[in-house]
Regions:
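C-terminal, non-catalytic tails of nucleotide-sugar-dependent glycosyltransferases
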Residues: 66-86, 192-196, 200-202, 224, ...
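Short, acidic, metal-binding catalytic loop of nucleotide-sugar glycosyltransferases
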Residues: 104-113
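A conserved acidic beta->alpha catalytic loop
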Residues: 120-129, 172
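Short aromatic/hydrophobic "clamp" motif used to bind/position activated sugar donors
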Residues: 165
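Conserved donor NDP-sugar-binding/catalytic core segment of glycosyltransferases
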Residues: 173-208
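A short, conserved alpha-helix in the catalytic core of glycosyltransferases
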Residues: 181, 222-234, 239-271
């Protein structure tokens, strides 16, 4: 396999950083590291030496199929005017039957002006084989490797054309029109995020089921928001590779109007849908999913732990 050529400017920055580290100028070293990462590379220190590696897998073209190495490599529609009422985003990884069940429910009850984006995030061979083929209402976007939940959501958002984006987990089976009630909720400018399942917390530390009505956050089973807000407030933090608690973080980002200003609302709206087994949870051993959940929750506390104005019903 051919090695990826390191650009001259990146290599020069790496040597400058090595000199800064030798001089114990840690601030300069950190600043240069950020420049290297912004250029799409990561630096690994090896004593006084270093190694440079691409920050993301490469984007690969196989005939007419493109597999993207990062969310940022996916062409974005966010600068274009919205077209249509909503875009539903589904992330496909390892469970083709779950994706097909969710798609069947959407197809049976699709509303005019609704498009669908399936993000095949490093799909298993079985999932890759079962991805929807030529369908004018469904776009499939593939990644080279498993990028993680936040990156997959970013991919779907970048390809969304509808004025509202609905991220629908494949464990959810629509039994009716799940789009219209959420679009209607977001017609209220005081609402920043809406969905079928909400949770509440008095302190942003412990959450319990809440709704219908005003809640603290919307769960990622069905979470809807304005495409324009995603463009203005995104992208999502891609350190959230595991799905758990990303929905809380994104809900708070969408609600936050800044300290001293009343936050926007999160509203749970009844939708005609059935929740099935969430395989992203049950497929992992309990210690591993608890570890990953805690890591994600610390990111919420780091950013919003002091924001008691965001606690309680939004």
């Amino acid at each position: 396999m051919a090695r990826t050529r390191i650009p001259d400017d990146v290599l020069s920055l790496a040597h400058d950083r090595a000199k800064a580290r030798a001089a114990r100028d840690w601030a300069a070293a950190d600043r240069i590291r950020a420049q290297i990462e912004d250029a799409g590379w990561k630096i690994v220190d090896r004593g006084t030496d270093f190694a440079l590696e691409p920050a993301h897998p490469p984007t690969v073209t196989e005939g007419e199929i493109v597999r993207y190495g990062s969310s940022g490599a996916v062409p974005s529609r966010l600068a274009e005017p919205a077209a249509g009422v909503a875009t539903v985003v589904l992330v496909a990884t390892d469970w083709p039957a779950d994706l097909e069940r969710a798609l069947a429910g959407l197809r049976a009850h699709v509303t005019e002006g609704t498009s669908i984006v399936v993000v095949a995030d490093g799909p298993s061979p079985a999932q890759d084989e079962a991805l929807p083929g030529d369908d004018p209402g469904i776009e499939v976007v593939r990644t080279t490797e498993r990028l993680g939940t936040a990156a997959a959501w970013n991919v779907g958002i970048r390809r969304a054309s509808g004025a509202v984006v609905l991220i629908l987990d494949t464990s959810v089976e629509p039994a009716g029109d799940v789009v219209t009630p959420l679009v209607a909720a977001l017609a209220d400018p005081t609402v920043g995020v809406a969905g079928g399942f909400g949770i509440v917390s008095p302190d942003l530390r412990a959450f319990v089921d809440g709704g219908p009505g005003d809640v603290t956050a919307i769960e990622g089973y069905a979470i809807a928001f304005r495409r324009s807000d995603a463009a203005a407030r995104g992208p999502l933090d891609e350190r959230f590779r595991f799905y758990r608690n990303l929905d809380i973080w994104w809900s708070l980002v969408l609600r936050d109007e800044g300290e001293g200003s009343p936050p926007r609302r999160a509203v749970a709206v009844p939708i005609p849908a059935t929740r099935h087994e969430h395989r992203g949870w049950t497929a992992l051993p309990e210690p591993e999913r608890d570890r990953l959940s805690k890591r994600n929750f610390y990111r919420i506390i780091d950013r919003f732990g002091h924001r008691r104005d965001l606690a309680g019903p939004g």
